[in-house]
A protein has these predicted regions:
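Intrinsically disordered, low-complexity polar regions and short flexible loop motifs
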Residues: 1-244
């Protein structure tokens, strides 16, 4: 492929569908190496991390690397991995994920053919350094390509409570976002109805005995409420039965 210096321009699309340049950087491409540029931070003060790693010829195996782009750059995680279906207690400690560093990990069950990871299905766990309490667990991941997989932890805005995602990068232009299988969500409700009466909103999951209700006056915004992952039925009512 192409080698030598390459200029990269990063831009975003604003609310008027116009391109706004974030920054321009130059990277040096090397023969037989992959170059990964990670943009993090915010648009006003972007952070660019550039990583290089050797591209190997792999057969029925893959390599595993990871880094972190959490807002708090001091945040680190211990990385564990198990064969699909095995609990955390059977997982193998691979090492630490650190911001600003791209770390490669060693397969715990290498053989004479290769010390790289076998193509298979796995579960990945993250803990705080030195802890055995899981703070992030992936669903079953099919790591079935003979390539280099790069894992990137990042902050996640939105309804998920712990606010973290794990991105999985391959050779393609697609980035696979993985969220915690046990992540809880949050919701809040705004009563915008033109009525003098308060509205009662009820969230009902699989267990009707644990239904959550909140009453809101006109124009009132409720607090964030945490709920477990799952499907919910939402009902709203007013005391005079004008809304159901």
């Amino acid at each position: 492929g192409e080698k030598g210096d390459l200029e990269l321009e990063f831009y975003r699309i604003d609310s008027d569908d116009q391109e706004v340049v974030i920054d321009t950087i130059t990277v040096t491409l090397k023969t037989s190496y992959k170059t990964l540029v990670v943009l993090s931070g915010d648009f006003e003060s972007p952070v660019f991390d550039t990583y290089e790693y050797y591209r190997e010829s792999l057969e029925d195996h893959f390599r595993l690397l990871a880094t972190s782009t959490m807002f708090d750059s001091t945040t680190t995680f211990d990385l564990y991995m198990s064969d699909s279906g095995d609990p955390f207690e059977a997982a193998n400690y691979l090492g630490t994920i650190t911001s600003g560093e791209l770390t490669e990990y060693t397969y715990w069950d290498g053989d004479d053919d290769s010390e790289d990871f076998n193509e298979d299905e796995y579960t990945i766990y993250l803990t705080e350094p030195g802890s055995d309490e899981v703070i992030f667990e992936t669903p079953t991941l099919s790591l079935a390509y003979n390539t280099e997989y790069v894992l990137i932890t990042r902050d996640l805005s939105g309804a998920i409570q712990n606010g973290m995602a794990l991105d999985v990068l391959l050779n393609s232009t697609t980035v696979y976002e993985v969220t915690d299988v046990d992540a809880t969500s949050q919701y809040r409700i705004y009563n915008s109805l033109n009525t003098d009466s308060p509205v009662t909103v009820t969230f009902t999951g699989d267990d009707e005995a644990e239904a959550i209700s909140v009453q809101l006056a006109p124009g009132e915004v409720g607090e964030f409420t945490e709920v477990e992952y799952g499907d919910y039925r939402i009902t709203a009512s007013i005391a005079d039965n004008s809304l159901t």
